[in-house]
Amino acid sequence: MAAVAADPAAAAVPASAEDRDTQPEAMPDLDEQWRQIGNGRERPLRAGESWFLVEKHWYKQWEVYVKGGDQDASTFPGCINNAGLFEDQISWHLRERLLEGDDYVLLPAPAWNYMVSWYGLMDGQPPIERKVIELPGIRKVEVYPLELLLVQHSDMETALTIQFSYTDSVELVLQTAREQFLVEPQEDTRLWTKNSEGSLDRLCNTQITLLDACLETGQLVIMETRNKDGTWPSAQLCGMNNIPDEDEDFQGQPGICGLTNLGNTCFMNSALQCLSNVPQLTEYFLNNRYLEELNFRNPLGMKGELAEAYADLVKQTWSGYHRSIVPNVFKNKVGHFASQFLGYQQHDSQELLSFLLDGLHEDLNRVKKKEYVELCNGAGRPDLEVAQEAWQNHKRRNDSVIVDTFHGLFKSTLVCPDCGNVSVTFDPFCYLSVPLPVCSRRVLEVFFVPMDPRRKPEQHRVVVPKKGNISDLCVALSTHTSVAPDKMIVADVFSHRFYKLYQLEDPLSGILDRDDIFVYEVTGRIEPVEGSRDDIVVPVYLRERTPSRDYNNSYYGLILFGHPLLVSVPRDRFSWEGLYNILMYRLSRYVTKPTSDEDDGDEKVDEDEDEDVEDDSSSEEEKEEMSAPTVNDGTREAEQEQAGTSSGVTERCPSLLDNSLRASQWPPRRRRKQLFTLQTVNSNGTSDRTTSPEEMQTQPYIAMDWEPDMKRRYYDEVEAEGYVKHDCVGYMLKKSPVQLKECIKLFTTVETLEKENPWYCSSCKQHQLATKKLDLWMLPEVLIIHLKRFSFSKISREKLDTLVQFPIRDLDFSEFVIKPKNESSPDLYKYDLIAVSNHYGGMRDGHYTTFACNKDSGQWHYFDDNSVSPVNENQIESKAAYVLFYQRQDVGRRQSQTSSSDTPASPVSSSTPNSDIMDIN
C-alpha cells in the first residue's frame, strides 16, 4: 500500500504540523481519534477476523500526540511506519521473536482502516495482516503463521514456501500441494514430513490440524504420487520409516540421550533433562507405577494425557537405544494444554518446569474427589500442631508422586504495622524461588561535551547508584572532568536529535545501557527566570538540504546529521546574528571559515538590495566582538543548557521570547558570507514555518541548515565525529561471587508488602502494608531452587549474571529449617546436587542446557539439545546456573542400596569431556 502523506517531501522530512492540512481524509478531533481506536482495541477476538500489527514506537508517538490535545502539536507522528518489524524491505518478512507490547500493538481491521485513512502508510510497506485463530481454550492472533516447504518426490530440489495457519488441516496442505504441482484429479497422492533427524514420517490422518500434526515452520513436506502400475515411489525411496538409520543398531547408557531442538525449544529440553534425572520420579515411570494412578476425571488435570506423554518420553530416553529423540509429541501436548507454550518462541525453563510439575501432579493425583478444606488458622496454637494440620489438609486434596517427591512446607508470618496483629500460616511449596543479592551500583557510559570548542568530546564510564538521580551522574562525572555538577546537563541523543533532556531529579533507572547519553558543560543557571540576566539555552540541530527526486530536484528536503548542540546565549546577544557568531565559534574545531577571497568572490548584491543594506562600517573592535565570543580562563561562559522532555520543554520559557530575537531578522543584513541559515524548528527538527518566534508557546529549537556544497567545502565530518577516550573507559565494575546460602538467607528475611499487594488485617479491618517473613518448616526429598536471575521493573528488564557458588555435596539446611530439631532427624537437612538447568544469554534470547548426574552410574553429563558429553564436577558451577535440583542424602542412600541389588547398568562411555564444548563462560 502506498504512503498517503500530505507533505510532498514526506520521504525526506519528518511529518510536521503543516502536513495535516492536506491529508486525504479530514481527521476527527483528537478525543474522537482516541475513542475510536481505544474502542477498537477492546474489541473481543473472533476466529477468522483480521487484525493488523503496528510498530510500538510509532503507536506510542501517536498516543503522545492525541493525549496532548493539540492537533497542531509537534508530536504529530506522521505516516504509519512499520519498518522496525521487518527483516528487510525486499521480502518484507516479519522479524523473529517480536513481542506484543514490546515491539508492536494489534489493531482490529476497522481501527487499522481509520489509522491509514488519517495518517497513511509509509510508501512501499505492506500492511501486516494476521488472522484470529481458535485454539483449545483460547483465541489468539496468529502473528507467526506456519511456513512449510512443499516438494514433490520426483523433484526434491524445487521447494515452494507456503504459509498456513496452525488450525488448518493436513487435508488443506495436500490440496494446496496438488494445485501447486498441477496434479491431475484422478491421481492418488499422499504426504510425508521430514523431521530434524532426517527420517520421514507419513501424514496418515489428513483431518487433524497442523498443530496436532506437530508440524513446524521450515519443515519439509513431500508429496508423492502413485505410479501408473499402482505402486508408490516410497517403496524405492530410502528412509521412508520412523527410525533414524543411526539408531537401528545403537546400544548405549540408559539416560544418556539428547533431545532434538524443534525450534527455540532448548528451554523445554533443559527442564526435561533435569526432571528425567530425578531418580525416584524416573523409576516411578519406568516401572509403570503411574498406570495405576492416572486420574482421567480430575477437572484440574489433563485427563492423563500429559502424564502419558511424559512417560513415553522417559521410556525412550532411558531405553538405551537412542542417541537422541525428537520430543514433538510431548511438545504438542504441552502446547495443547498450555497455550503460552504454543508455537516456537523462546520461553523460560523454570516456567515450563512449574507447569509440568503441576500438570503431572493433577494427572497423577490419587485423590479422585477433592473435599472442601477450611484454611488452617494458627489462633495462638503451637506451630507444630498448626503445621501438622496444614500438611494433612494439603494431603487430603493433593496426594501424588509429585507431592511425595517435591513438596515442602513454609511458615508465613505477617505482622500488622498499626496494631501489631500477627498472622501465622503454613503453606506448601514445590520449589524455592530465591533472590540474588543485587549490586547497588551500575556503570554508565556517557560522552562529555566541554564548552571549549578546541577540545573533543570525551567518552567516560562512571559508577552511579542504581536508584540514584541524574544529579548523581553529574557528581560522578565531576570527579573525572573537574567541572562542577551544577554546570552539567544530561541528554539522551537519538537519530541526530534530543530524545530527552533530563532534569536533575530524574531517576537514573530511566537510562538504558543502550542509550547514547551526552553530558554538556554549561554556565549560569539551568532554568533562567524571567527578568534575570542568566544566559538563554537554545537546542540546536544540524540539517542538510537534499533535492527531492519526485520534483526533478526543484524541491529540497532537509535531513538531520551530526550531533545536536545545546548553546547558551547571553541575553544581550540573543539575536540571529549573535547566535550565528556563537555557533561559528562553537563549531570552529570542525568548521572552516571562508577566506577573504571566498567572501569577495561569492558576494554579489543587487543594487536594489544595496539600498536596504546598512553600511558595514563598524570598527574592527565591533567586528571582533561580533565574530568571536569572549573566553574566560580557557572556557566560554556563554553556554548554558536547559533540560526538558523528548518533545521539548512543555512550559513557556519567557527568556526565549526576548524582544531582541523578535526584532532581529534572518539573514542578518550584512555582506559577510553565511555558511548556513538558521530557523526555528520543533523538537523533532521539523521546520515549523507557520509559527513565528513570538508565537511559540514552548521552547523553540534552532536548526542550522546547510547547502550540500557548503557542507562539503567547510564542514569536516571526520573531525566532527571525533572523540577521545578517558582513562576511566576501561573500568569494569567487579562483581563478587555470592554463596547459595546467602540467597536462601535473603529469601527468609523480613520484607514489607508492596502497595499493589496489601494484606487485610482482621484486627484493623483494613488493608495494611504488613511485614512478611517466610521460613522453611519441612523440606522435600528433592528440593528445586530457582535462582531469580531475571529482574523486572516498570521501565527496565535485566538478567543478573552474578556467579552463585553452590556445593555439589553436603548442602546443609539445618540453619534455615525452624521445625524443632527434636521432632526430626538431622539427616533430613543435607542434600546433594543431581541436576542444573543453565541459561546463557540475555533477557529476550539465549540458550538453555543441562548438567545432570546419571542415577545408575553417578557420572555427570552435559546435555545441549541432542548433544550429550560427560563432564567433571568442577565444570558444573558457572554464571549460567539457573535452576538447581538437590536430593536429600537419606533418599539417595536408600536408592543406592536398592540399585545395588538390581542388574548392573550399562557401563559409562569411555569418551572424555569435550573441553571445546564446556568452555562456555
Curated annotation (Swiss-Prot):
E.C. number: 3.4.19.12
GO cellular component term of the entry, any: nucleoplasm
Chief localisation class: nucleus
Subcellular location: Nucleus; Cytoplasm; Chromosome
Compositional bias (Low complexity): 1-16, 898-915
MF annotations from Gene Ontology: cysteine-type deubiquitinase activity; cysteine-type endopeptidase activity
InterPro entries: DUSP-like_sf, Papain-like_cys_pep_sf, Pept_C19_DUSP, Peptidase_C19_UCH, Ub_carboxyl-term_hydrolase, Ub_USP-typ, USP_CS, USP_dom
Catalytic residues as annotated in Swiss-Prot or TrEMBL: C266, H847
Residues in USP domain copies: 257-889
UniProt region (Disordered), positions on chain: 1-29, 593-668, 893-921
Keywords recorded for this protein, A-Z: Acetylation, Chromosome, Cytoplasm, Hydrolase, Nucleus, Phosphoprotein, Protease, Thiol protease, Ubl conjugation pathway
Every DUSP domain range: 28-133
UniProt-listed GO biological process terms: protein deubiquitination; proteolysis
Keyword match Cytoplasm: yes
Pfam families: DUSP, Ubiquitin_3, UCH
SMART domains xrefs: DUSP (SM00695)
Catalytic reaction equation(s): Thiol-dependent hydrolysis of ester, thioester, amide, peptide and isopeptide bonds formed by the C-terminal Gly of ubiquitin (a 76-residue protein attached to proteins as an intracellular targeting signal)
Acidic residues biased stretches: 597-624
Phosphoserine PTM positions: S596, S692, S906
Modification N6-acetyllysine, positions: K194
Assembly description: Monomer. Associated component of the Polycomb group (PcG) multiprotein PRC1-like complex. Interacts with RANBP9/RANBPM. Interacts with BRCA2. Interacts with CHUK/IKKA. Interacts with NFKBIA. Interacts with SPRY3, RAE1, MYCBP2/PAM, and KCTD6.
Biological function: Protease that can remove conjugated ubiquitin from target proteins and polyubiquitin chains. Inhibits the degradation of target proteins by the proteasome. Cleaves preferentially 'Lys-6' and 'Lys-63'-linked ubiquitin chains. Has lower activity with 'Lys-11' and 'Lys-33'-linked ubiquitin chains, and extremely low activity with 'Lys-27', 'Lys-29' and 'Lys-48'-linked ubiquitin chains (in vitro). Plays a role in the regulation of pathways leading to NF-kappa-B activation. Plays a role in the regulation of DNA repair after double-stranded DNA breaks.
UniProt similarity note: Belongs to the peptidase C19 family.
Name of protein: Ubiquitin carboxyl-terminal hydrolase 11
Organism: Mus musculus (Mouse)
